[in-house]
């Protein structure tokens, strides 16, 4: 019972459905044609029997006026029964007398045998009628034989259609089987899995949809891996970079809690704790921005007006650093597709580095647009960066020899990250103002 329930509960395969649909589709016209042929055969056999009776009657009628002593049989139909009635006299060519029936053709039973009877009225002084009959046995046997042939032909036609459908369905479902095999062979760790199917357009559409789905899954998997790597990196770097300042803070706090220091020394220790706390806060904030940058996607990119972005950055820098002279070189509007917050972060960090580590008092912002893209430059009159250190300072927690030790060492790393996220580069050069020039080269839309 369980096996049967499983069989009937199981969803039929596509191949089976194609075969069933083809068999039903073939059965309908075959049954219609078979029914027409069946009825046609039945009527034709009956018409043949009627023609036999007509022929036998036509042969017998000329002999009736000669007398009823002998009624000859038709030479073409020796089995035909002939019964002649003239008045009250009834004469038959056999021991079976056909009953009197209405004119034309009629069916009757004599001694339990079914007969087809043709009755013809002959005009004359005395009413005379000739009844010619024949059994249905031969006609029924012949009709049944032809009916069996029709059934066999119809059954063969439907069966042949089902067999051909089964064979052709094998080719039709082959792309789907290939798709299933390729899907089963895909492991969770596969990179950019490929699903290639050729054949039916429906299978190709499903394969394309699966490729898109797998690509999205793969992209999300990569993002998850990147997020996990970023989290591990964040934890490792945070542990390494924060251990020293936290140890210094703990030492200072222990000194404050255990020693009775003079006011000036106590104030100096407290200031050191505050500076260390600010450094830790800056480091954590920079690490957070780095992690956010690594998790950004192309969906976050929007049109950005670089000229307007630099103008706002210059105004904000003038407010944050009152002693700094910040200017923007006039230029036409430059619009690219990018991350507004990320580009603003890169420009702000470049200005902050120029002030904090280069001691700059003059910063000049500019943007130049070309077919290749946009080039953003931040020039300052600070101490600059030695040529041998211009690549190293873009690494995380890397500080130049001229940099102060109060920063997190992540400012230029954030700039390099944003350049990479936009498909561009970040580099340091000599500035016409005497200090350093930080250049962001961002490609235009492809």
Curated annotation (Swiss-Prot):
Cellular-component GO terms for this entry: peptidoglycan-based cell wall; plasma membrane
Reactions it catalyzes: ATP + protein L-histidine = ADP + protein N-phospho-L-histidine
UniProt PTM comment: Autophosphorylated.
Enzyme class: transferase
Residue positions, PTM Phosphohistidine: 240
Superkingdom in the source lineage: Bacteria
Domain Histidine kinase: 237-446
Transmembrane intervals: 19-39, 151-171
Domain HAMP positions: 172-222
Record keywords, A-Z: ATP-binding, Cell membrane, Kinase, Membrane, Nucleotide-binding, Phosphoprotein, Transferase, Transmembrane, Transmembrane helix, Two-component regulatory system
Protein name: Sensor-type histidine kinase PrrB
Organism: Mycobacterium tuberculosis (strain ATCC 25618 / H37Rv)
This protein's encoding gene: prrB
